[in-house]
């Protein structure tokens, strides 16, 4: 009987270690680098991962909005892409932590405005 209990304890401990490894692997899915690699071939999956990353707060919100914008743009949903690019731009202009990111979002906004035939707005972002 004692032998049987020892085997059950060892199996339980082994199971816990294997689950811990899976958790570490799952957390690597919610990184900016991984999502940037998959948003072109799998935009819907990237959007699901972005929702979870936003809930877990593993990526800053301005970057989440940028990646959402790029994913929607890849699915030819230009209005949603513009909306999320604008959200990222507004967060950048409020916090002013990363001027390169703000410039990148300004370029995206100009491109999305031109795609939606809003040329005056596109010129405003371009200037």
Each model region followed by its residue ranges:
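Sec-dependent N-terminal signal peptides
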Residues: 3-12
